[in-house]
């Protein structure tokens, strides 16, 4: 059974967006053991998605940033082998907590360990992008309850020395980066994916966890973007057998094994890799 439906996703995004915006001006904030922030909005939004998708009795599972550590190994194995939604309730919690509108909500859909569909929602702009059966759609007025949905044609940015490139925190802090492009460090995947799809930034140096990319990577792949490591290895949508994620129990679980560069084509990924001296690639 394929339980990915545009109406269902957008209805959940409407409720999730309302929660996020309700707390946006002054979100209750805590710092987790891994030194990353979590807000009350993160927890309430994940509970919303869990109520809809955490149904193991129906062979439907949820991997969520804020609750996955409570799952036992039997649940995780079933989720990775079967039908599973992957949610990041607020991707970009740091900018969200600071009142910077570079955050969003990420939802991916896996079957048999492969990401087959994805969606991202930008509540501040009241907009979402989602895949459905080989097409990309853009939804406006999501929070109205009567979204305007239409096919979307991505507009990747053409390369120029002025084209912005986004980078993961550790890359920006520790790598030698010699390209002339403006470098943005936004602490969000959804915010960057949105800008890649709309041609506002050229590329991205990415190193993140499964839930950070689960909503956006199916969109980027369908749009023709490349995501490759320093050795040219592709980051695909096969989470389990692709070998690109740490999936065993341990401190790195759910993280990409290697950094990748995302760009509109392979030439773009190689151009960025050729202008950095990377350290600690995994």
Describe the residue ranges of each PLM region:
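Detector for glycine-centered tight turns/loop "hinges" at secondary-structure junctions
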Residues: 113, 126, 144-147, 232-234
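An extended, acidic
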Residues: 152-282
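Residue-level signal for inorganic ion chemistry
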Residues: 16, 20, 42, 53, ...
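DPxDG-like acidic metal-binding loop motif
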Residues: 75-140
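Short helix-loop capping/hinge motifs at secondary-structure junctions, enriched
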Residues: 136-139, 143-145, 267-271
């Amino acid at each position: 059974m394929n339980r990915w439906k545009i109406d269902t996703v957008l209805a959940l995004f409407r409720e999730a967006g309302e929660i996020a915006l309700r707390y946006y001006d002054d979100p209750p904030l805590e710092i987790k053991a891994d030194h990353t922030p979590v807000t009350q909005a993160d927890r309430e939004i994940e509970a919303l998605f869990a109520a809809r998708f955490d149904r193991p009795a129906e062979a439907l599972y949820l991997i969520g940033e804020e609750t996955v550590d409570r799952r036992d190994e039997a649940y995780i194995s079933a989720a990775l082998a079967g039908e599973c939604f992957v949610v990041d309730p607020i991707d970009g919690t740091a900018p969200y907590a600071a009142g910077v509108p570079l955050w969003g909500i990420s939802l991916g859909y896996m079957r048999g360990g492969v990401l087959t569909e994805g969606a991202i929602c930008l509540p501040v702009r009241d907009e979402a992008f989602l895949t459905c059966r080989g097409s990309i759609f853009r939804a406006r007025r999501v929070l109205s309850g009567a979204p305007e949905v239409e096919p979307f044609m991505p507009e990747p940015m053409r390369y120029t020395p002025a084209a912005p490139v986004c980078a993961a925190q550790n890359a920006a802090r520790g790598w030698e980066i010699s390209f002339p492009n403006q470098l943005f460090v936004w602490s969000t995947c959804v915010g960057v994916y949105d800008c890649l799809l709309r041609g506002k930034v050229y590329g991205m140096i990415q190193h993140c966890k499964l839930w950070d990319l689960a909503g956006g990577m199916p969109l980027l792949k369908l749009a023709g973007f490349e995501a490759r490591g320093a050795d040219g290895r592709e980051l695909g949508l096969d989470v389990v057998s692709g070998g690109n994620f740490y999936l065993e129990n341990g401190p790195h679980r759910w993280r990409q094994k290697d950094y990748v560069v995302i760009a509109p084509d392979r030439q773009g990924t190689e151009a960025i890799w050729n202008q950095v001296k990377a350290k600690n690639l995994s």
